[in-house]
Amino acid sequence: MKISGVDIRPGNILEYEGGLWRAAKIQHTQPGKGGAYMQVEMKNLIDGRKTNVRFRSAETVERVRLDTKDFQYLFADGDMLTFMDKETYEQISLPKDLLGDAVAFLQDGMDVVMELYEEKPISVQLPEQVEAEIVEADAVVKGQTASSSYKPAILDNGVRVMVPPHITAGTRIIVDVNTQEYVKRAD
């Protein structure tokens, strides 16, 4: 579906110069001289490249709709991850780098949403928050309790996060997958 350059919104998938791009940030600009344009920061869904493009209001761009399907993560085999379609039970293997940093939070049996373009996997969306266990936490430094201070801790998946002083090793916490930050203590 063709849309005007000024109708682009963050999260839109665009077909641009033969590739699939996700609009990350947009800025609408109306200079005093000349026509209005939309400054769009885009990320390539295939290879992860980023680019900034100006779209004038008269320009049109192809907006792509991706199909989404529910999958379940099964196991890792070297650099490949195996997922199972929850409807047809078919298995599919994808390279680890398709998930980026989020691969550390992948857990056996985790439900994920896969985005497909023409039946080809483009990206894998993990749940926004996952539960993890602290395996190592630094001691609290005395005298730092006046302001809200955080201390470094290492999760069971090897990821380093900053946690409040009351969190100790062995505590289960909820972590935001995208920002890799502490959210709250797990119940």
Swiss-Prot record:
<dbReference type="InterPro" id="IPR020599">
    <property type="entry name" value="Transl_elong_fac_P/YeiP"/>
</dbReference>
<dbReference type="InterPro" id="IPR013852">
    <property type="entry name" value="Transl_elong_P/YeiP_CS"/>
</dbReference>
<dbReference type="InterPro" id="IPR001059">
    <property type="entry name" value="Transl_elong_P/YeiP_cen"/>
</dbReference>
<dbReference type="InterPro" id="IPR011768">
    <property type="entry name" value="Transl_elongation_fac_P"/>
</dbReference>
<comment type="similarity">
    <text>Belongs to the elongation factor P family.</text>
</comment>
<dbReference type="InterPro" id="IPR013185">
    <property type="entry name" value="Transl_elong_KOW-like"/>
</dbReference>
<keyword id="KW-0963">Cytoplasm</keyword>
<comment type="pathway">
    <text>Protein biosynthesis; polypeptide chain elongation.</text>
</comment>
<dbReference type="GO" id="GO:0005737">
    <property type="term" value="C:cytoplasm"/>
</dbReference>
<comment type="function">
    <text>Involved in peptide bond synthesis. Stimulates efficient translation and peptide-bond synthesis on native or reconstituted 70S ribosomes in vitro. Probably functions indirectly by altering the affinity of the ribosome for aminoacyl-tRNA, thus increasing their reactivity as acceptors for peptidyl transferase.</text>
</comment>
<dbReference type="GO" id="GO:0043043">
    <property type="term" value="P:peptide biosynthetic process"/>
</dbReference>
<dbReference type="Pfam" id="PF08207">
    <property type="entry name" value="EFP_N"/>
</dbReference>
<dbReference type="InterPro" id="IPR015365">
    <property type="entry name" value="Elong-fact-P_C"/>
</dbReference>
<dbReference type="InterPro" id="IPR014722">
    <property type="entry name" value="Rib_uL2_dom2"/>
</dbReference>
<keyword id="KW-0648">Protein biosynthesis</keyword>
<dbReference type="Pfam" id="PF01132">
    <property type="entry name" value="EFP"/>
</dbReference>
<dbReference type="InterPro" id="IPR008991">
    <property type="entry name" value="Translation_prot_SH3-like_sf"/>
</dbReference>
<dbReference type="GO" id="GO:0003746">
    <property type="term" value="F:translation elongation factor activity"/>
</dbReference>
<keyword id="KW-0251">Elongation factor</keyword>
<protein>
    <recommendedName>
        <fullName>Elongation factor P</fullName>
    </recommendedName>
</protein>
<dbReference type="Pfam" id="PF09285">
    <property type="entry name" value="Elong-fact-P_C"/>
</dbReference>
<dbReference type="InterPro" id="IPR012340">
    <property type="entry name" value="NA-bd_OB-fold"/>
</dbReference>
